[in-house]
């Protein structure tokens, strides 16, 4: 059985669809609108002895564009391992990274000998506030024993949602650790450009920026938007402006990491989609204008890794903020990516954070505003 999209959850029909996968491994990407169907999917997979891992996302993606409901059923060929882990909310980044390291080490112990380093694909609950720091600590432990990629699942409303599941459990505040073959290494692209002078995060912790250049962070962001658009930004408008003009972290190697503010505290602090360390160098970014340029670039990079054919599936995780920026042009970007890659089908989800490297072999980073994509035989 190849990948399969379902939008109806009739138990009899769904059981017949799943029957060819008896005894195999399956990933399910489930739209938030259908989150109540997890128990049915778990029961049917358990009845058929299908080893299940899954996650809930705001919406799904197909070659035709956004899919607001339904589920992607993605059979996984061997070798493939997936483990769902709860993470203690009180744990700091080093402690959580150690838990993940211990689990991944046990998975690597049974990975085929003499094969190239696999890809460690991490699916986090998006409400974990210190994912970037967890990645830093994880890299210190695992280094180049694996390649790194991943995504964030959860609610598009940024509200708590148990969004990760296996055959028995449905968890919030956890991570699914997956080992994929080396040839499934995903690539990442965002295309956001600098549009303002550098600033300093003079007060920040986890995913909250309190002060920028010693001024309340929201006030500073308001001033930047006023300069660009001659408009006084309100709290309610923040997220819809920020997907077009997010903040960026400037790294020492010249790379830029997107951080999208999505809420404001009563004190005027900005709550972002991921961490911003104190004393980070910030700038205002401008979202890409072209809905094709970066899709073409990503397709070229995929094709340089492997010769994609109509027998390949593109598995894509596309930032929900990027989708709000491009609107209807999201479909253009996805179709360009599929056609230029040469693959035959596209399946994926709107994500709430993307883990990967801008260049193959680079240190893993936690991104926003990005497309994460890989090609696999189906």
Question: What function would you assign to each model-found segment?
Answer:
Residues 1-378:
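Hydrophobic alpha/beta core scaffold segments
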């Amino acid at each position: 059985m190849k990948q399969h999209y379902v939008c109806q959850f009739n138990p009899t029909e769904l059981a017949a669809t799943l029957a060819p996968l008896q005894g195999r491994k399956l990933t399910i990407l489930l739209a938030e609108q259908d989150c109540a169907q997890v128990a049915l999917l778990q029961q049917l997979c358990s009845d058929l002895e299908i080893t299940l891992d899954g996650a809930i996302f705001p919406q799904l993606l197909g070659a035709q564009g956004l899919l607001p409901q339904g589920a992607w059923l993605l059979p996984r060929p061997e070798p493939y391992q997936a483990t769902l882990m709860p993470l203690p909310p009180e744990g700091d980044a080093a402690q959580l990274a150690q838990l993940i390291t211990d689990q991944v080490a046990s998975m690597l112990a049974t990975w085929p000998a003499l094969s190239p380093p696999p890809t460690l694909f991490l699916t986090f609950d998006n409400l974990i506030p210190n994912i970037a720091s967890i990645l830093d600590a994880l890299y210190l432990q695992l280094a180049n024993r694996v390649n790194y990629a991943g995504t964030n699942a959860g609610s598009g409303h940024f509200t708590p949602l148990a969004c990760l599941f296996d055959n028995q459990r449905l968890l919030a505040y956890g991570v699914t650790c997956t080992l994929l073959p080396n040839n499934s290494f995903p690539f990442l692209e965002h295309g956001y450009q600098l549009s303002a002078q550098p600033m300093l995060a003079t007060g920040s912790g986890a995913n909250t920026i309190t002060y920028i250049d010693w001024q309340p962070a929201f006030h500073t962001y308001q001033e930047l938007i006023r300069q660009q658009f001659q408009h006084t930004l309100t709290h309610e408008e923040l997220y819809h402006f920020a997907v077009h003009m997010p903040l960026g972290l400037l790294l020492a190697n010249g790379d830029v990491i997107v951080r999208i503010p999505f809420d404001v505290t009563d004190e005027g602090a900005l709550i972002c989609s991921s961490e911003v360390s104190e004393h980070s160098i910030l700038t205002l970014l401008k979202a890409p204008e072209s809905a094709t340029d970066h899709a073409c670039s990503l397709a070229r990079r995929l094709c340089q890794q492997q010769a994609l054919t109509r027998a390949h599936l593109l598995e894509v995780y596309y930032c929900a903020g990027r989708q709000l920026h491009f609107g209807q042009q999201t479909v253009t970007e996805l179709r360009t990516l599929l056609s230029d890659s040469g693959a035959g089908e596209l399946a994926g989800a709107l994500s709430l954070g993307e883990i990967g490297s801008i260049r193959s072999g680079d240190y893993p980073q936690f991104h926003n505003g990005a497309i994460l994509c890989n090609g696999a035989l189906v």
